[in-house]
Amino acid sequence: MAKTFKLKIVTPEKIFFEGEAEKINLETTEGKTEILANHSAFIAMLVPTNSKLITDKGEEKKFFLSSGILKVNTEEVVILCDAAEWPEEIDKKRAEEAKKRAEERLSKKDGVDIKRAEFALMRAIKRIEMV
């Protein structure tokens, strides 16, 4: 049996996931990473990504994870994020509309917060890919 760790994923609205996990794959500003039990402690900024976790029962769960903070220590992994969604919770039409709006904002450039628009585009693309 694989070693596990406590995992808690929290959004402003709810506790998205709380339980034991064998591993979780996600993406930080430094790149893609995989967290296993007894991982060295660190804190990182998360970017929107399609993530995957393996529960203590060996069940694979895929989900969308928005920006946030990842805190890892030897006892647990805590993710505080803007949003987390299972594939069945994602409204594909809404995500496609968000993608279109972000692309339109980026094409204008004047008076547009480019970083914010790029972030919105990345988030929409990842949500669409998840469904």
From Swiss-Prot:
Gene Ontology molecular function: ATP binding; proton-transporting ATP synthase activity, rotational mechanism
One Gene Ontology term, aspect cellular component: proton-transporting ATP synthase complex
Domain of life of the source: Bacteria
Signal sequence region: none
Keywords: ATP synthesis, Cell membrane, CF(1), Hydrogen ion transport, Ion transport, Membrane, Transport
Cited InterPro entries: ATP_F1_dsu/esu_C_sf (IPR036794), ATP_synth_F1_dsu/esu (IPR001469), ATP_synth_F1_dsu/esu_N (IPR020546), ATP_synth_F1_esu_C (IPR020547), ATPsynth_dsu/esu_N (IPR036771)
CDD domains assigned to the protein according to its UniProt record, in alphabetical order: F1-ATPase_delta (cd12152)
Recorded topology in the membrane: Peripheral membrane protein
Gene3D superfamilies, A to Z: ATP synthase delta/epsilon subunit, C-terminal domain (1.20.5.440), F0F1 ATP synthase delta/epsilon subunit, N-terminal (2.60.15.10)
Major subcellular site: membrane
Compartments (UniProt record): Cell membrane
Family recorded in the similarity comment: Belongs to the ATPase epsilon chain family.
NCBIfam families: ATP_synt_epsi (TIGR01216), PRK13450.1 (NF009984)
Subunit structure: F-type ATPases have 2 components, CF(1) - the catalytic core - and CF(0) - the membrane proton channel. CF(1) has five subunits: alpha(3), beta(3), gamma(1), delta(1), epsilon(1). CF(0) has three main subunits: a, b and c.
Function text: Produces ATP from ADP in the presence of a proton gradient across the membrane.
Record protein name field: ATP synthase epsilon chain
Species for this entry: Clostridium novyi (strain NT)
